[in-house]
């Protein structure tokens, strides 16, 4: 925010410096702030996942994680919805100021939580002493990393995560243009239809989480979600199917798949690993996921520019044929289905209990 206000001018200086590494000081400080925010966002995601697993293990774990995912989707969509209107009405720095205020609110909420968590730790410690057992919480050890990496369940969950999300998030980046070019949907509403998966995840993830808590079937649900993803991308890849209603129905199905897999996948990590290794496991999974979310959009962008230019728009920018990218997404979705099958097989072999309910009676 400071970079966009106090350092906004072309002649702005910081400690008498006008340029840093060839960039205007304001631009460089904005880069630095955004980078720090990115690191903090990942740390927060890992920490929140670990906290929820700690508080709700053996209880409504999938429901709690589903609510957390839903709230995250609300935040993401709200950011997209209000940023441009705020910038137009009050200036380009206003959305950043709003983000700063929300982050301060989050920090206050964390301090309140820390007090509550300390109380829970004391209760858990007292219960462990009374039961004659040791608390599962331990300090970080590199041995934990080794134990995680040699666990087949880790690699299957991590691969499923990166393959599944690589078929969803990169696709959403150009879904609006696909709606307009292939299906003839008006550009004023194309973005709304492209946002249906996020809306579906917001509503359905807690619902599916509640089902998993009571009935189980996590491995089967991940298998079902991956199969639905294949159907969606395969039909999108067929050139002759270009009716607008088909596109909308496929977006709704994608939203259901986008709810099924996360509602089962993230709580499954808490069944595969003890609490003492959960934070490390989530961190490693997020790390692998981000490699895919960097690599797949890069690949799709290269394919579009190299093989898929179909013409020019009135403003001179390229128009694209998305058949090849959709075939790539279909192939990745097929790989996610194979991994989901292997995970279900591993569940039977290693006794992860993924098919059992989360709520322990």
Ranges and model annotations:
Residues 151-205, 262, 296-297:
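Extracytoplasmic gate region of multi-pass secondary transporters
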Residues 204-217, 304:
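Helix-to-loop junctions at the C-terminal end of transmembrane segments
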Residues 218-265:
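C-terminal transmembrane helical hairpin of 12-TM major facilitator-type secondary transporters
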Residues 27, 33-71:
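Cytoplasmic helix-loop-helix junction between adjacent transmembrane helices
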Residues 62-88, 286-297:
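Glycine-rich segments within core transmembrane alpha-helices of 12-TM secondary carriers
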Residues 94-113, 323-342:
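Symmetry-related core transmembrane helices of the 12-TM Major Facilitator Superfamily/SLC fold
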Residues 1-23, 227-241:
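C-terminal ends and interior cores of transmembrane alpha-helices
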Residues 121-157, 359-361:
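Juxtamembrane intracellular "pre-TM" segments in multi-pass secondary transporters
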């Amino acid at each position: 925010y400071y970079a966009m206000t106090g350092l906004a001018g072309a002649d702005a200086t910081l400690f008498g410096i006008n340029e840093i590494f060839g960039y205007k000081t304001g631009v460089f400080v904005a880069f630095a702030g955004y980078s720090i925010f990115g690191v903090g966002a990942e740390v927060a995601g890992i920490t929140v996942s670990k906290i929820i697993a700690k508080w709700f293990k053996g209880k409504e774990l999938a429901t709690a994680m589903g609510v957390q995912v839903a709230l995250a989707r609300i935040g993401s969509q709200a950011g997209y919805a209000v940023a441009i209107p705020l910038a137009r009405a009050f200036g380009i720095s206003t959305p950043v100021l709003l983000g700063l205020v929300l982050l301060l609110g989050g920090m206050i909420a964390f301090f309140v939580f820390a007090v509550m968590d300390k109380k829970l730790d004391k209760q858990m410690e007292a219960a462990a002493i009374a039961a004659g057992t040791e608390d599962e919480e331990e300090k970080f050890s590199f041995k934990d990393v080794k134990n995680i990496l040699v666990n087949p369940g880790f690699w299957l969950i991590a691969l499923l995560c990166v393959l599944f999300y690589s078929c969803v998030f990169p696709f959403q980046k150009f879904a609006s243009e696909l709606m307009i070019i292939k299906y003839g949907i008006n550009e004023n509403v194309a973005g709304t239809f492209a946002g249906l998966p996020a809306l579906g995840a917001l509503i359905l993830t807690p619902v599916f989480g509640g089902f998993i808590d009571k009935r189980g079937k996590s491995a089967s649900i991940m298998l079902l979600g991956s199969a639905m993803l294949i159907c969606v991308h395969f039909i999108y890849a067929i050139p002759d199917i270009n009716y607008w209603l088909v596109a909308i129905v496929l977006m709704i199905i994608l939203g259901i798949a986008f709810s099924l897999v996360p509602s089962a996948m993230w709580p499954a990590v808490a069944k595969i690993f003890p609490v003492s290794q959960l934070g490390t496991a989530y961190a490693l999974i997020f790390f692998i996921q981000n490699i895919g979310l960097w690599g797949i959009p890069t690949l799709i962008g290269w394919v579009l520019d190299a093989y898929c230019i179909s013409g020019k728009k009135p403003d001179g920018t390229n128009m694209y044929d998305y058949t090849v990218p959709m075939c790539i997404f279909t192939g990745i979705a097929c790989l996610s289905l194979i991994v989901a099958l292997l995970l279900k097989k591993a569940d039977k072999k290693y006794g992860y209990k993924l098919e059992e309910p989360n709520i322990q009676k």
